[in-house]
């Protein structure tokens, strides 16, 4: 890809990089190899066009993309389509029986216990910490020479770690953050192999690359979080943070509190899943705005009108409409969790297809968000899709970056508020430009990330030589 002229790009439709699907379903050996490279490469072209695609395998899978059918799986008959056991097999060593990996009553009481902590009124109290996370990145960029290139994906991971340290674990969070940074990369590298083995139902004892590293970090990370919980229990200081609220949370029906092991399970889930999803959402959004200066100008103009000269606060979040439009379109094109799976607990009929018990059901969020029957010009970056007056133009089951139904990500609202506050803070402070001749490649590693990172040139607004968009004008 040649360098794009910003002025020309503002009037030219933007079609950012996408995964090219195979024209036909893959046979087992090729499917296995492609899955290891990028699980999205195993979703055939038909899934982007048809409401239901049945693959007899091996491996056998039913891809469900029609919103009405998705609703059946996730809501109407959700008991017939429980969470696929492979998630527990792959992630259970780290996350145990958390709200992410548990099922049935075990999931229900945890959800009831934790849900009050993620209501909107509770979330906005943490906006200052979210802004501080963005400002930590701005501080680092300001210290660099003007126009320096930065690894935005790594910077956003650091910034969202900062948010964790100031919302979930003030005081002890910095140490855990450093440990997480060391362990996450090794752990994520082994995920593809362990998932592929689980899909093929290979024995758990069979050697695989990364297995030893994953086991080490499962033990290490769980021990660090358990120690932190014990320290907080014995600390005489008063804390007003998400961690303390989680320790004191009770099931409204039974008055039951979480035992230490479940606290470890859920804290690790929030720590890892929470910050990675927001970090990658910001990474892709900053890239898209670097390629769409017309939308960058609109976003900047709104930020300056709504926020003015002070910091972003909780009162600003709902008024940053254009910022949220851009974020939603980024989440559509690059959903942080690009694929969900369920399985059939019994024989079921779906869209005229008889599906036997034990069949893997694929909910390819990435493909649903780019489905040719559901979206006009689906691969185009167009935030106007999410304008307030067009909210009734799409189903809640065709846009679901955080899932849908009872099992929707419990931290979805927190993530959206965090992304809004941080993006507004970042865009007001800096301009981003993509100078790479190579497009970023979306690859699924639990979350959707750029395969080789996301280098962007960062120029602080107001510095000499930075006239572009200095007043919110293209």
Each predicted region: which residue ranges?
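Cytochrome P450 heme-thiolate monooxygenase catalytic core
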Residues: 6-20, 82-88, 122-280, 298
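Cytochrome P450 I-helix active-site segment
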Residues: 15-25, 127, 131, 182-187, ...
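Cytochrome P450 catalytic-core helices
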Residues: 277-296, 300-302, 413-428
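N-terminal membrane-proximal hinge/A-helix region immediately C-terminal to the signal-anchor transmembrane segment
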Residues: 2-105, 109, 128-136, 175, ...
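Conserved cytochrome P450 K-helix E-x-x-R motif and the immediately C-terminal K′/meander segment
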Residues: 29-53, 223, 227, 310-351
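Cytochrome P450 proximal C-terminal region
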Residues: 2-12, 41, 134, 138, ...
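Conserved cytochrome P450 K-helix/beta-meander segment immediately N-terminal to the heme-binding cysteine loop
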Residues: 363-391
């Amino acid at each position: 890809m040649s360098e794009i002229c910003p002025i020309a790009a503002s009037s030219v439709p933007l079609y950012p990089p996408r995964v090219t699907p195979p024209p036909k379903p893959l046979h087992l050996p090729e499917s296995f190899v492609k899955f290891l490279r990028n699980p999205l490469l195993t979703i055939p072209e038909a899934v982007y066009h048809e409401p239901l695609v049945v693959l007899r395998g091996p491996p056998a899978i039913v891809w469900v993309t029609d919103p009405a059918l998705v609703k059946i799986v996730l809501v109407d008959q959700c008991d017939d389509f429980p969470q696929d056991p492979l998630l527990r097999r792959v992630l259970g060593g780290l996350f145990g029986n958390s709200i992410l990996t548990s099922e049935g009553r075990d999931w229900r009481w945890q959800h009831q216990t934790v849900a009050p902590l993620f209501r909107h009124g509770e979330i906005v109290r943490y906006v200052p910490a979210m802004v501080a996370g963005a400002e930590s990145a701005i501080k680092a960029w300001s210290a660099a020479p003007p126009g320096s290139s930065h690894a935005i994906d790594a910077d956003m991971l650091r910034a969202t770690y900062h948010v964790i340290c100031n919302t979930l674990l003030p005081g002890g969070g910095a140490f855990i953050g450093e440990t997480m940074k060391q362990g996450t990369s090794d752990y994520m590298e082994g995920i593809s192999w362990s998932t592929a083995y689980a899909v093929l139902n290979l024995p758990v004892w069979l050697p695989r690359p990364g297995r030893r590293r994953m086991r080490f970090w499962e033990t290490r990370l769980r021990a660090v979080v358990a120690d932190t919980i014990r320290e907080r229990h014995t600390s005489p200081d008063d804390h007003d943070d998400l961690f303390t609220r989680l320790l004191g949370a009770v099931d409204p029906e039974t008055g039951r509190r979480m035992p230490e092991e479940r606290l470890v399970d859920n804290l690790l889930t929030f720590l890892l899943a929470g910050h990675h999803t927001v970090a990658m959402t910001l990474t892709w959004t900053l890239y898209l705005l670097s390629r769409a200066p017309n939308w960058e100008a609109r976003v900047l103009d709104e930020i300056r009108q709504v926020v003015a000269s002070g910091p972003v606060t909780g009162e600003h979040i709902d008024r940053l409409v254009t910022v949220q439009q851009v974020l939603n379109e980024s989440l559509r094109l690059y959903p942080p969790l690009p694929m969900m799976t369920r399985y059939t607990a019994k024989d079921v009929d779906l869209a005229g297809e008889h599906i036997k018990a034990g069949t893997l059901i694929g909910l390819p969020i990435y493909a649903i968000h780019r489905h040719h029957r559901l979206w006009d010009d689906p691969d185009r970056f167009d935030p106007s899709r999410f304008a307030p007056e067009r909210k009734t133009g799409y189903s809640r089951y065709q846009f679901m970056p955080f899932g849908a139904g009872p099992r929707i990500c419990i931290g979805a609202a927190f993530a959206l508020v965090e992304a809004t506050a941080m993006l507004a803070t970042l865009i007001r402070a800096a301009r981003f430009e993509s100078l790479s001749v190579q497009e970023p490649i979306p690859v699924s590693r639990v979350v959707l990330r750029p395969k080789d990172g996301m280098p962007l040139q960062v120029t602080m607004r107001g510095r000499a030589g930075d006239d572009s968009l200095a007043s919110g004008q293209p």
